[in-house]
Amino acid sequence: MRKLIVFFSFWFSVTIVVAQNTERKLYSIAFYNLENLFDTIHDAGKNDYDFLPDGSYRWTAKKYEAKLHNLSDVLSALSRNLVPEGLAVIGVAEVENHRVLTDLVSQPAMANYKF
């Protein structure tokens, strides 16, 4: 019985030591509030009138493109020093619709990532 206990203790110790030498893959996740990322097109059923060219924010295509550019620069820089491949998962808030997210990930700063 003692030999059996010693054997399993040795086997378990070797297994732990071998497992410690395995290579690890690092992934990064982030959450970012995009702060009212709206395009200039009205979506039926949504209260997005402030973000139209004649709305209270005078939201234009130029402003929209500038915001996309700036946000894509920031998001692509997150965790770049830790993980060269970039973020594995990005959670976002305050986005108008799927089309706006597609525009964001199509920006040159984010085009090389697999979104």
Per-region residue spans from a language model:
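Bacterial Sec-dependent N-terminal signal peptides
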Residues: 1-22
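N-terminal, active-site-proximal structural segment of metallo-dependent hydrolase catalytic domains
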Residues: 19-114
